[in-house]
From Swiss-Prot:
IMP binds at D13, E14, G15, K16, N38, A39, G40, H41, T130, R144, Q225, T240, R304. InterPro entries: Adenylosuccin_syn_GTP-bd (IPR018220), Adenylosuccin_syn_Lys_AS (IPR033128), Adenylosuccinate_synth_dom1 (IPR042109), Adenylosuccinate_synth_dom2 (IPR042110), Adenylosuccinate_synth_dom3 (IPR042111), Adenylosuccinate_synthetase (IPR001114), P-loop_NTPase (IPR027417). Plays an important role in the de novo pathway of purine nucleotide biosynthesis. Catalyzes the first committed step in the biosynthesis of AMP from IMP. Mg(2+) binds at D13, G40. NCBIfam families: PRK01117.1, purA. PROSITE patterns: ADENYLOSUCCIN_SYN_1 (PS01266), ADENYLOSUCCIN_SYN_2 (PS00513). Homodimer. SUPFAM superfamilies: P-loop containing nucleoside triphosphate hydrolases. This is Adenylosuccinate synthetase. The keyword Membrane does not apply.
């Protein structure tokens, strides 16, 4: 039995798409368990670059089962647009290789409208949402007024729930935000058509995933975003609306914790963040710009420039602790090549006291000053390295120190964007 989690150990954008794609080679099933089409990752295979947002990365392989779990919020329009995009790239998506949970909640047009309107209303206190309707959909889920995929398969149930929701949503949209109301008939027609298209893909994914694990198949659970965007343990309120830590697999895919055998945290060799919120190691100078351009740090979904800084092992230690990580996969080592001195944050100075954890209060985190260790950099390109021994000596010293500081082994090192730019150091 083998069921393992792949998730982001920082603020997202760590290279999960590439690493999930690589690890999916040895998996039979790939499962998304939280988030929605607000996630964005790029996978490069030979001369093609695939940009995925919702469909699991295993779709790029033949004979893999890909699952959109119950913890995902599903925008059916976005899903079928991605299906068509993949077909245009030569990737077939069928009910045989993509299964959608009947319990997943649906993102509705009013969710997207409310997402954008509430963000605009916040003004300078905006969160930095992608505007995809993720948060409002999870809000309805928590309020128990959400509409699920299974409702689409029962048109009369869907119509009644849509009518009830629209009465409230239209009141908010028109009276609070001064926007035009949504038309019931238009949404009804559009979504019932989606229901017909979705029907062949819809199953009870919990039963399928459970049986696959029980029968000895390898199941990979693919996280979206990153540990510090977790709704409970991230840098709240600048977080996403779901549980992105390892434990989120259990409710998001409906399996028990004892079925998980390992968890791999994906981390860049430096740190990036999109949007607002404290960022202790952020570099607001030429070095930050250099890392951004060398690593092409711009969002797949939004195109926004990412904030860049030195590696923060306080963040990685927290990820290892709260997600039960058994190893790290380090990406973007190649981006640091050519830098004379490389720094790593080993702790924070908080009002004169050294701490090695992330305070819950953002006001306290903003007062934390990074305590650095400095390392000699490496001029050699690492792109041609295909084994750990072929890496530059200083790069290996850098990675070894990360293992010591986080008390977690590094199982994989990525030296470039393509599948073959991957070095397996140990078993995951």
């Amino acid at each position: 039995m083998s069921a393992f989690i792949v998730l982001g150990a920082q603020w997202g954008d760590e290279g999960k798409g590439k690493m999930t794609d690589y690890l999916a080679q040895g998996a039979d099933v790939v499962v998304r368990f939280q988030g929605g089409n607000n996630a964005g990752h790029t996978v490069e295979v030979e001369d093609k670059k695939y940009k995925l947002h919702l469909i699991p990365s295993g779709i790029l392989y033949k004979n893999k089962v890909n699952v959109i779990g119950n913890g995902v919020v599903l925008d059916p329009k976005a899903m079928f647009e991605e299906v068509e995009y993949l077909k245009g790239m030569g990737v077939e998506v069928t009910p045989e290789n993509l299964i959608v949970s009947d319990r997943a909640h649906l993102i509705m047009p009013y969710h997207r409208a409310l997402d954008g309107a509430s963000e605009k209303h916040r003004g300078k206190n905006d969160i930095g949402t992608t505007g995809k309707g993720i948060g409002p959909c999870y809000t309805d889920k928590a309020e128990r007024s959400g509409i699920r995929v299974c409702d689409l398969l029962h048109p009369e149930v869907f119509k009644e729930k849509l009518k009830s929701n629209l009465e409230i949503k239209n009141a908010i949209i028109t009276k609070v935000y001064g926007m035009d109301a949504f038309d019931y008939n238009e949404i009804c027609e559009e979504y019932l058509a989606f229901g017909e298209k979705l029907k062949p893909f819809v199953k009870d994914t919990s039963v399928i995933v459970y049986n696959e694990i029980k029968n000895g198949k390898k199941v990979l659970f693919e996280g979206a975003q990153g540990n510090l965007l977790d709704i409970d343990y991230g840098t709240y309120p600048y977080v996403t609306s779901s549980n992105t830590i390892g434990g989120g697999v259990c409710p998001g895919a409906a399996i028990g914790p004892t079925m998980i055998t390992s968890a791999v945290g994906i981390a860049k060799a430096y740190t990036t963040r999109v949007g607002k919120g404290p960022f202790p190691t952020e570099l607001l100078d030429e070095m930050g710009d250099r890392i951004r351009e060398a690593g092409f740090e711009y969002g797949v979904t939004t195109g926004r420039a990412r904030r860049c800084g030195w590696l923060d092992t306080v963040i990685l230690k927290q990820a290892a602790r709260v997600s039960g990580l058994t190893s790290f996969a380090m990406t973007k080592i190649d981006t640091l090549a050519g830098i004379d001195k490389v720094k790593v944050c080993i702790g924070y100075d908080f009002n004169g006291k050294t701490i090695d954890y992330i305070p819950a209060s953002l006001e306290d985190l903003a007062l934390c000053k990074p305590i650095y260790e400095e390392f000699d950099g490496w001029d050699e390109s690492v792109a041609d390295a295909r084994s750990y021994d072929e890496l530059p000596l200083n790069a290996k010293k850098y990675l070894k120190r990360i293992e010591e500081l986080t008390e977690t082994k590094i199982s994989i090192v990525s030296v470039g964007p393509e599948r073959n730019h991957t070095i397996e150091v140990s078993d995951i």
